Structure formats: structure tokens, C-alpha cells
Regions:
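Helix N-cap at the beta1-alpha1 junction of Rossmann-like dinucleotide-binding domains, i.e.
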Residues: 36-39
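Conserved N-terminal Rossmann-fold NAD(P)-binding element of oxidoreductases
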Residues: 4-11
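Rossmann-fold cofactor-recognition segment
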Residues: 49-64
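C-terminal catalytic/substrate-binding lobe primarily of soluble NAD(P)-dependent oxidoreductases
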Residues: 156-407
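Rossmann-fold NAD(P)-binding glycine/threonine-rich loop
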Residues: 107-135
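ADP-ribose/adenylate-binding Rossmann-like module
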Residues: 83-86, 95-118
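Conserved Rossmann-fold cofactor-binding substructure of NAD(P)-dependent oxidoreductases
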Residues: 61-77, 88
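N-terminal Rossmann-fold NAD(P) dinucleotide-binding loop
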Residues: 13-17
Length: 407
């Protein structure tokens, strides 16, 4: 029915590839493309005999627009699923524009030399995508992605007005290493060492990194420390959820992770600025990435569960109301199914679902969109079908926040 070009061959890409191959009625053909073709060939070798989806592979440098254009013109995909690096989003969008190919990603663009991510660069493509008659679906991972769909679903079915949204991202997994990141180390460490922020009463409130803390008792996981971070979906939800008064994002971290991160930051290893070493320039955080375990290798050794969702407060039929919509994912179950830990799984499954929404016409219209701008119902049904079942808890525990240094 459709041809998908999947750009990337890391942990999330592996999940997208597996799920597209499970969904061969929709994805009849896929091309896996990466800078390192041998990684793509490995996926093909593993899966081709287990699926009706026809798999091809290609080498491509996602920083090189002419290379991307040449590949798209040769393969003629209906959709491009971008699970490469966020630095490469705009290059891939440029190629999609030139070749009139629909586009889906899981994380918004950020410049490689600055630890700052926001949607303005991709939203600026809206008119060009409209004129080209193609769809760009931004942020169809879990957070951003499913969390935005949860917001649209809550707005449609549970509230007349949503007043507050707290997005909670809990990883209760244990990989056994003193320090490792569950997705791209460079992206992860840049994100958590940056200033935090939240949306309140129509404007941004900025915080110091890890300044605000909470402890939350997560269903099926238990009590975890969590910290307020800046996260990209706050920006789009503030625009797309009318009347919302406050949006915050929290992520859980263990003490070992925070101690290691602070030490690395103190000695300059999280810097994005190049330094001279033995006659060549290196970027400290990129060098650190080379030393840390590859997130794709964590699957077999990670145990425990994730709990990711949104706590909403608001009004329905004149009465105050609160709910928690969430998913729980088991690391070992994910590994049994697609040889991945749950962090990659919870990002890769929604990327496939978002792409399916576009190619089947359910979420297809010209322009650049965030997930919460579409009807959430078919996406929510697909989550249950494809491995990320969700639950709704009425009157959940609400989040209480304090300054981390006041513990």
C-alpha cells in the first residue's frame, strides 16, 4: 500500500523497522537508510524472511540534501520517517519538499552547536509544505508524541476546559551500569543539563537545571524522584490546547545518574564547544558519547518498567475534575518482541503509528502539524493494538513541587 523511507539505524529506528514489518498491510515496502549501510543490512538480514514487507537498504548522509534528494527520487517513497538526529531535521524536510514526500519525526530540530531546541525552525516550513501539498507530522514519539495525543484525547472526551497539564516521564528500569543513557547520549545529556522551563498564565517561566523536584508514586513502578525540565511539547501544547493555564514536564532520575552528570558537567565534558586536542578539534560531549554504552546495547540487560503519561486538571459540566492518562511498558517484554529496551520502544512504536495515520489518509492534510492538532481517536486505538496500551486513572495523586536544594 505504501513505501516508507526510514532514515536512521539506531535503537529507535530498529523499533520503527520491526513495527513497520509487523504492519506489512500498510507498509508494503521500506528502505532503511543510514550513513552506515552495514547497520541497515543487518536489519534486513534479520527481518526479511519474517515479514511480507519488502526491505531495501541504502547509504545516505542525512546532512547532505542532494544525497537525500537523489535517494528519494530513486526510491520514490510515500513517506519519510526521520529517526536520525534532531540536527538533521531541516535537511530531511528540505529533501521531502523537493521530492514531495510526506514527513514524520520524533524530536524537534536543534542546532548542533547550541543546546537549544524549539519548534520555530520547523513551523517556518508550514506554508511551503501547504503549497507542495504534503504533510509534515512533527514529534510522533512518546514525549513529544503520545503525550500530545493524550492531551487531545482528554480535551475531546474528558474536559470542557483543561486548566493544567503535568507530563510525567518515569523510567523505572535498571541497566546495571554506573552511568549510561537510554537514548542518544549527546541529545539526552544536552536536554537534562539545560535550564528548565514551564508555561504558566500565557508566558514561559525559566528555571535553573534540575532546580525543582518532586516525588511521585507511579502505578506499577513505585515512588521515584523526578525533576522539572524544559521539553518541546510544552511549546506546541500551549498553542494548541485552548485555555490551558499551566504546562509542566517532569522526568525521573536516580541519584547515581545525577552525580555522574554533575561531575561530567563540572569538568567540561557536556560542552558543545570544540576544543583543540593533539592538533585536532573535538567536541567534548561527542567524545563522551563515544565512551558511553550504546543505548541500542542496553536491551538485554535492562529490567523494570516505564510509566509515561499526563495528569490533567480542569472542568467538566461545571465540576472540577482530574485524570491521569498513562502507559506502562516493560523493558524485558520489549526486548523479547523487538530486541530493544522500553525507551526506544515507546518512541519507535508511535513513529510507526504516526506514519500510518498519514499514509492511510486519517491524518493527511497539507502543512506542518503537531500530533495534538488531529483527531486522537484512531491513534489511541492504534496504541492499544501495536503494543502501547494506555489507562485512565480518575482523581490521581497530583504533583507537589519543591526546590531540590531544600530536601
Amino acid at each position: 500500500m505504501s513505501r516508507a523511507l526510514i532514515i536512521g539505524a539506531g535503537g529507535v529506528a530498529g523499533v520503527v523497522i520491526h513495527k513497520c514489518c509487523q504492519n506489512s498491510e500498510v507498509f508494503t515496502d521500506i528502505c532503511i537508510a543510514s550513513r552506515t549501510k552495514s547497520k541497515c543490512d543487518k536489519f534486513k538480514e534479520e527481518l526479511q524472511d519474517k515479514t511480507k514487507t519488502n526491505i531495501t537498504t541504502a547509504q545516505v548522509n542525512a546532512d547532505n540534501v542532494p544525497e537525500l534528494v537523489a535517494l528519494m527520487k530513486e526510491y520514490k517513497p510515500d513517506i519519510c520517517i526521520n529517526v536520525a538526529l534532531p540536527y538533521q531535521d531541516l535537511h530531511i524536510m528540505d529533501a521531502c519538499l523537493e521530492c514531495k514526500v510526506d514527513y514524520v519525526d520524533t524530536a524537534n530540530y536543534e542546532p548542533e552547536d547550541t543546546a537549544k531546541f524549539e519548534y520555530k525552525w520547523q513551523w517556518a516550513y508550514r506554508e511551503r509544505f501547504e503549497k507542495a501539498g504534503i504533510t509534515a507530522l512533527l514529534g510522533s514519539g512518546f514525549d513529544p508524541g503520545v503525550t500530545g495525543v493524550f492531551c487531545a484525547y482528554a480535551q475531546k472526551h474528558y474536559f470542557d476546559e483543561i486548566h493544567t497539564i503535568d507530563i510525567l516521564d518515569c523510567n523505572g528500569g535498571d541497566h546495571g551500569y554506573p552511568f549510561a543513557t537510554n537514548f542518544n547520549p549527546e541529545i539526552n545529556l544536552r536536554e537534562v543539563s539545560a535550564n528548565g522551563s514551564y508555561w504558566e498564565d500565557g508566558h514561559w517561566v525559566e528555571t535553573e537545571p534540575m532546580e525543582f523536584k518532586s516525588v511521585y508514586d507511579f502505578p506499577e513502578v513505585g515512588k521515584k524522584d523526578m525533576y522539572l525540565l524544559h521539553h518541546e511539547e510544552i511549546e506546541s501544547l500551549a498553542k494548541n490546547i485552548p485555555g490551558v493555564q499551566r504546562i509542566r514536564f517532569f522526568m525521573t532520575f536516580g541519584q547515581s545518574y545525577l552525580t555522574h552528570m554533575k561531575c561530567l558537567e563540572n569538568v567540561g565534558m557536556l560542552s558543545t564547544a570544540p576544543v583543540e586536542f593533539n592538533g585536532q578539534e573535538i567536541v567534548p560531549i561527542q567524545f563522551l558519547k563515544a565512551l558511553l554504552p550504546d543505548p541500542a546495547s542496553l536491551g538485554p540487560r535492562t529490567v523494570g518498567k516505564t510509566n509515561i503519561g499526563c495528569i490533567f486538571t480542569g472542568v467538566k459540566d461545571g465540576k472540577e475534575k482530574s485524570i491521569y492518562i498513562y502507559n506502562v511498558c516493560d523493558h524485558q517484554e520489549c526486548y523479547k518482541e523487538v530486541e530493544s529496551q522500553a525507551i526506544s520502544y515507546t518512541t519507535g512504536v508511535p513513529a510507526m503509528i504516526g506514519s500510518m495515520m498519514v499514509v492511510t489518509g486519517q491524518w493527511k492534510k497539507p502543512g506542518v502539524f503537531n500530533v495534538e492538532e488531529f483527531d486522537p481517536d484512531p491513534y489511541m486505538e492504534a496504541l492499544n493494538k501495536w503494543g502501547l496500551p494506555w489507562k485512565v486513572c480518575e482523581d490521581p495523586e497530583l504533583v507537589k513541587v519543591w526546590k531540590a536544594n531544600e530536601d
